[in-house]
């Protein structure tokens, strides 16, 4: 039987286990979950994503809810990329329950696509191509700080390609 890795979200927060030196993704759910999806396999691990059922979940010692963006500095890069994909799959499922053609219920067809039970319309998560521009002068880079940033973050200039 293959081992599992569970990317569990609650209001945009990712459940992480702090083992004292590093953070890791839980190997099994620690509370009631909903919208469980198998979204891949990596290093002989089955990758699942789901949402926590409760608004306020009392966590066992060593577990924390951490924002996906904040987890960037806490998780190894491959795990962070998997967490991003897990979040995308949940978003896709939440926002594509019904067919845009006939209004019937959509069912999962593949790990990353849904198909209408009535008309056969198949959809995949939308790709939004973005461009990031580095504005620099010598060794200095132009960064921006938006009022909407909750913490002391600076970002590059970015925009979407139409």
Regions found by a protein language model. Give the residues of each.
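Extended serine/threonine-enriched, polar tracts that run as long, contiguous segments within proteins
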Residues: 160-162
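N-terminal alpha-helical interaction blocks
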Residues: 1-77
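Residues immediately within or flanking Cys/His clusters that coordinate Zn2+
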Residues: 93-96, 103, 113
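Cys/His-rich Zn2+-binding cysteine-cluster or related metal-binding knuckle/ribbon modules and their
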Residues: 88-97, 108
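Cys/His-rich microdomains that often coordinate metals
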Residues: 103-106, 123
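Short, basic and Ser/Thr-rich N-terminal targeting/leader segments
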Residues: 32-33, 43, 93, 100, ...
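N-terminal strand-loop-strand
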Residues: 110-156
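Phosphate-interacting basic helix/loop segments used at nucleotide- and nucleic-acid interfaces
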Residues: 85
């Amino acid at each position: 039987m293959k081992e599992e890795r569970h990317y569990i979200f609650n209001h945009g927060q990712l459940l992480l286990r702090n083992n004292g030196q590093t953070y890791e993704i839980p190997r099994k759910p620690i509370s009631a979950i909903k919208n469980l999806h198998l979204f891949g396999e990596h290093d002989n691990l089955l990758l699942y994503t789901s949402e926590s059922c409760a608004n306020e979940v009392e966590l066992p010692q060593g577990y924390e809810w951490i924002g996906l963006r904040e987890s960037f500095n806490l998780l190894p890069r491959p795990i962070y990329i998997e967490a991003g994909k897990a979040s995308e799959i949940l978003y896709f499922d939440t926002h594509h329950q019904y067919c845009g053609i006939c209004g019937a219920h959509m069912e999962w067809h593949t790990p990353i696509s849904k198909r209408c039970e009535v008309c056969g319309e198949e959809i995949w998560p939308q790709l939004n191509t973005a461009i990031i521009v580095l504005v620099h002068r010598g060794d200095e880079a132009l960064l921006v700080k938006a009022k909407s940033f909750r913490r002391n973050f600076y970002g590059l200039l970015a925009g979407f390609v139409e």
